[in-house]
Amino acid sequence: MRLKVYKIFIVLFFLNSYSYSQNKVSGFAFESGTEIKLNEVSVYDAEVGLITKTNSIGYYEFTTEKSVITLVFIADGYQFIEKYLSIEFDTNLDIIFSNPIQVLNEVVVKANNKKLFQLSRLDDVQGTAIFAGKKSEVISMDLSMANLASNNSRQIYSQIAGLNIYQNDDAGLQLNIGGRGLDPNRTANFNTRQNGYDISADALGYPESYYTPPAEALKEIQIVRGAASLQYGTQFGGLVNFVINDPTSKSFEIVSRNTLGSNSLYTNFTSFSGTSKKLSYYSFINYKKGDGFRLNSDFESFNIFFNFRYELNNKTSLSSEITYLKYLAHQAGGLSDKMFNSDPFQSNRSRNWFGLNWFLYNFKIKHQFNLNSNFSFNFFGLKATRNALGFRTNRVDQVDSNKERDLIKGEFQNYGLESRFLHKYSLKGKKNVFLIGVKFYKSDNDSQQGPGSFKSDADFEFRLDDFPNYNNQSKYNYPNLNYALFSENIFYLSKKFSLTPGFRYEYIRTESEGFYKKINLDGAGNVILNKTIDDSEIRERNFFLFGLGLSFKSSKAMDFYANISENYRSVTFADISISNPAYSINPEISDENGYTFDLGIRGNYFKRFSYDIGFFSLLYKDRIGFVQKAFKDGSVKSEKGNVGDAVMYGLESLIDFDLNDIFIKNNNLSLNYFINSSFINSKYTESMEPGVKGKKVEFVPKLNIKSGFKFGYKNLSLNIQYTY
């Protein structure tokens, strides 16, 4: 009966004959006097950001529901033009740019862009996604003064509140960010995507992100906090989506950058792009090599990307993408507190290596049925390998024995599809937006652990015949299956107030099939036990997640938002089957679940300063962590398992001041000051482990402050940043 009601509910939405008023704004961009039509002119909504760009004949077009809108037109080499428009019907608006500036001034162009947003937010609806009532942030890469060549995450993400960031290389090979006290390691607590599709090793069993797109290739980075769990996956951290640059409207364009840095750093980024009638493309090659800032931390990386788009007509487009990454990195090893205080650049691991091969593919269809109905289909897949080799022990200050090394090899094969339908409709005179989507995901991954060679090179081959009694040996296959149904609906109760309820249904089936070896030696080093133990497990679960968001936009300068959503994190391969001398695994380890709550206010005050100030809370049940335990053999180790229930809560804020607009008002000048701060408290509220209840949650930074100035004058730009 419930299924029938649900079907009727969906049909009513599809057949709804109401639609709310949408008007088209269109026109041409000209140069004054010459009547030359200008392409690649950016058209911005001052409240939202980039809407569109003029095509090869200088024409632009977009639809809007707004009755009043402030548009900003920006063309390279020209002074920007700002237009206030009152819209009742389809409107034609031609834009005439005055004589071009004789000296192209990049800082002036960036300063014009900053009059819109330095760090913008996602609109209520974008494409086939809903972001109303959610805490969202967008990093515009063309405005960033970060070191893009080295993917410097501390600079790139400096204005994202509450992020804990750490870097272990000076080329940005891997991104390590965690929000609101979550573990930053390989961004595993975020659902990580590129152009809207998954790029992690395994979204369920191994959500770590080994591939990070080069910042030079990015148009923007979209971040949505824990409320993203309903549309993008169940993680507590939320969504990180890397949006690659769009193809140029020119017939052909090549951009090449070469960068030299300390520690023998060399990077090359070369992109190729063009458009010919209905076909467009964008591709890049990125090469990085360096010695690293520590001993034994040299690396070499090669990354290539292709994107092809074909516009079937003005309503339907097809696109396909291929990404390949290969890199080899020397691993310098960890440091104890004593070692770090003595010399933070030292290394006592010369035989540790990490190698990666990453191949991603994607096919996408976008179709607009009419002004109110949009559809998207995403097919994506991954074929990849990772190899970790080295001397591993539970004490980082232990001297390398120069014996056989521990080798862990992983092979990942997965594919999935995600389809979305978004429909705008009216109900009792009020506009609403309905979204429904489905996702299917299947993976078949393999992991093997055993002895590697005793040499020092990056030899990723097992030496089972040479070292048959090596202690850490296992081999597993992980066939996983996941499908999901999700839906959200924006109810605009007034022009200013909206409610957005939603749900996500998940079916997850994770399996492990394999074995591990139990090997015991006597005091003389003789083998007294060498036993192969079969180990297979099936975990099957299905559940609903629910959420509710609200937004009250009292004015252009002020938007109140609140959201509560359920989250879920399944145990990973590493949680259940990888042997580690530093800790053991509790055999009863199980999934985590909980809630994320946001309450905040954000806005842009007359383009003089933008702000986002909010309170958040993460409620964890069965949080996975570590506790010290004594074992029967007399050893004392950390055990990984469900430590208990925990809560993390705090205040986070970002305020960005345009000091030039406030005090100086010089179009040749760019001067900004920002302060990004978060204050977090945490504790375990329940636990079966003695001495845990009431204690602080580990690795949660109480205070996290980033602040900086950004200065630009004509073709000179400088920035300074402080982190505490």
Q: What are these language model-derived features?
A:
Residues G127-I130, E137-I139, M145-A201, K219:
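Extracytoplasmic beta-strand/coil segments of soluble accessory domains associated
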Residues F421, K495, D612-Y620, K637-Y724:
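Gram-negative outer-membrane beta-barrel transporters
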Residues T63, Y197-R225:
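Short acidic/polar hinge/loop motifs at secondary-structure boundaries
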Residues Y44, I74-D76, D90-A146, R154:
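Short, acidic, small-residue-rich periplasmic hinge/interaction motif at the N-terminus
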Residues L279, K364-Q368, N374-G390, K553, ...:
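Membrane-embedded beta-barrel scaffold of Gram-negative outer-membrane proteins
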Residues L260-K289, R294-H330, W353-N372, K428, ...:
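Transmembrane beta-barrel wall of Gram-negative outer-membrane proteins
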Residues E220, R225-S229, L239-G274, I285, ...:
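Short strand-turn segments of transmembrane beta-barrel domains in outer membranes
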Residues N313, K431-V433, K439-Y441, Y476-L619, ...:
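Structural signature of Gram-negative outer-membrane beta-barrels, strongest in the C-terminal barrel
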